[in-house]
Amino acid sequence: MSRLEIALSSTPEHLLKHLLLGTVLLTSLYALYRRLLPKPLPGIPFNQKSAQSIWGDVLELRDDPSGLAKWCSKQLENHGSPICQALMGPLSKPVVLVADVGNAREMLMGRSDFDRSAYIIDRFPLFGEFHLNMKTGDNWRQSRNWLKDLLAPQYLHNVAGPAIHSSVLKLIELWQHKFHVGDGRVFSMVSDLKTLALDVIVAFHFGSDFQDSALDRQIDHVGKLDGSKLPSGEYNEVEFSKAPLHEFQQGLTDVGDKMAAIYTTKWPPLLVAWWVRYVSPYYRPFFEAKDRFIRKHINLAVRRCRSDEDPSTGIDYMVHREEKAARKARREPVFDKQIMVDEAYGNLIAGQHTTSAALVWILKLLADYPSVQEKLREELQGIFDSAMQENRLPTAAEIIKSKLPYLDAVLEETLRLRAAMLVPRDAAKDTELLGHRIPKGTVVLLVCQGPDYKPSPPSKYWSDVKASRMYPGKGNPDLEIFDPERWLVRNEKGDLEFDGSSYPQLAFGLGIRSCWGRRLAMVEMRIMTTLMILKFELKDVPKGLRGHEASYDISYRAKKGFLHLKSRGEFP
C-alpha cells in the first residue's frame, strides 16, 4: 500500500470531502481567473505584464495624468511599432492602437470595413438620435440628407457668412471694452470664444427667429464694470465676471460641458447620462424645455415651407429637405419625431463646443509665433487693400471669396497640431490592418499625434510603413513645430498657393463619416482670424499663462487661453 493510500485510509471521511471541495473551489477560481484574463489578438504587440492581470492596462491608464491620447502615443513608442493593442480589463476585447502612418488612415477611414465606433457612441448618449451617434445606416443617411443645403455656397455666402461676420464684430467690441476696462491687462479668451461660437451656431439654425445675442449681453455687462474693482490673478491677469445667458443658450453651454465630463468619467457613461437626463434637478428641466423650444422653431419652419417662402434659417433648410424626401418616398414627413429635434440639438451642441476650441488654438499659436502673425497680417493688408484705403474691415463676402493662401496654411497647420488626437473606428467585419487580422467588432484608435510626429522613428518596425509625410511645402521637418510653410507651394507663375490635399489633417475626419460642418467651421475660422489680426496685435503673455496643456473630450481643448491685446486703431 502506498503512502498516499495509507494517508487517505486514515483520514476521516468529512476531511476528505472538505479537501475535495477545496480542490474543486481552487480549480474553479483559477479557471475563472484564466477566463477573466485579457485575450490579446495574435501577432499584435501588447504589454506582457498587463496580460497577467485581469485588469489589463486599465489601472495604468487610469493613473496616467497625461490622459488617454498621450497614453496611447506612449504605448506605440514603447513597443517601437506602428500598431499595438491595449488590454481593457475583464471580458473586454482589446483596443487596437494604430499610428497615423503609411496608408493606415485611408484603410481606417476610407473603407467600408470600418464604421463609427461604439467607443464614441457609448460616451455621448445625451446626443440622443443625432447622426454623430449613429452607425452608418438608413437613419444616419436620412439625418445627413437634411444638412446638405447647409453646405451649399448660397447658404454659406448669404446666411452663414454674414451671421459670422456680425458676431465677430460684436466680439471685437467686447474685447475693446475689456481692453479699456482692464487697462490693457491680459485676460482669458476661452469663455468669449465659446460665446462667439454659441451665437454663431444659434444664428445658423434660427436666424431672426431668435434675437437674444449672448455677445450683446456680455458687451452690456462689461461696459458697466468698474475696472478698479476687478480681481486679478497670479500674473496680474484681469478676471471678468460673465453676464447670465438666455436659458436655452445657457443650457446648451452647460450640457456641452457635461458631455465633455462624461467622455472622461470613470463611471459608466450610460449611467451618468441617465442620471443627468432624467434625475438631475439642474439638467432634467433643460432637456424637457429644449425639446419644446426646438419643436416650436421646426413648426415655424414648416409653416414657412408650406407657404412657399424661401428658406432663410438652418431649420428652414432641414424642413425643406425632409418635405422633398417625404414626397419622393410617398411617406409622411417626420417633423414631429424626436430624430429631427435631436439632429438640430446635436448640431447646436457639437458646433459651438468644437469650433470654439479651434479658435482658441489659432489665436494662441499666432501670439506664440509673432513672425507668422506679422506675415499673415501683411497678406491680409495686401489682399484687402481697398478696404484698408477705405479705413474699414473687409466684408464677409470679401473674406470668403478671396484667395488667402497664407491664412489657409495657418488654419490648416493649427488643425494639424491641435485638433484630432484620436480617431476611433469599429471593424464592421473581419478585416486586416497593417498585415494583422482585426476581428469584427474590434475598436481601432488612430493615434494622430503619436511617435510618427518625431523626425526619427524609434524602431526598425516602422521601416515598412514609415513613409515621409507628403506635405507639399518646405516646412520644418519636426512635425511638432507650428510652421504654415509646409502647406505652401509656388505655381508655374511663381505665385504662392495653398495645397491642403497632399496630406490632409484629421480635424474633421475623412470618408463618409467625416464632419458635415467642416465648411461652416472653416468659414468661421477664416472670418474670425482675418478680422482679429487686422484689428489687434496679439502680444506675448506671461510665461505662466502660455502653456499648451490640454484636455481631450469632444475636442482637444486648451487649458490656458489668455490674450494680451494691442489695438491697431486703423478701423473705427
From Swiss-Prot:
Classification via InterPro entries: Cyt_P450 (IPR001128), Cyt_P450_E_grp-IV (IPR002403), Cyt_P450_sf (IPR036396), Cytochrome_P450_monoxygenase (IPR050121)
Keyword field: Heme, Iron, Metal-binding, Monooxygenase, Oxidoreductase
Pathway: Secondary metabolite biosynthesis
EC number assigned by the record: 1.-.-.-
Pfam families: p450
SUPFAM superfamilies linked to this entry: Cytochrome P450 (SSF48264)
UniProt-recorded Gene Ontology molecular function terms: heme binding; iron ion binding; monooxygenase activity; oxidoreductase activity, acting on paired donors, with incorporation or reduction of molecular oxygen
Cofactors named for this entry: heme
Binding positions for heme per the UniProt entry: 515
Domain of life: Eukaryota
A GO BP entry: mycotoxin biosynthetic process
Enzyme class: oxidoreductase
Family: Belongs to the cytochrome P450 family.
Task of the protein: Cytochrome P450 monooxygenase; part of the gene cluster that mediates the biosynthesis of the 6-methyl-2-pyrone derivative xylariolide D. XilC hydroxylates the 5-alkyl-6-methyl-2-pyrone backbone called prexylariolide D, produced by the highly reducing polyketide synthase xilA, on its side chain to form xylariolide D.
UniProt-recorded name of the protein: Cytochrome P450 monooxygenase xilC
Source organism of the structure: Penicillium rubens (strain ATCC 28089 / DSM 1075 / NRRL 1951 / Wisconsin 54-1255) (Penicillium chrysogenum)
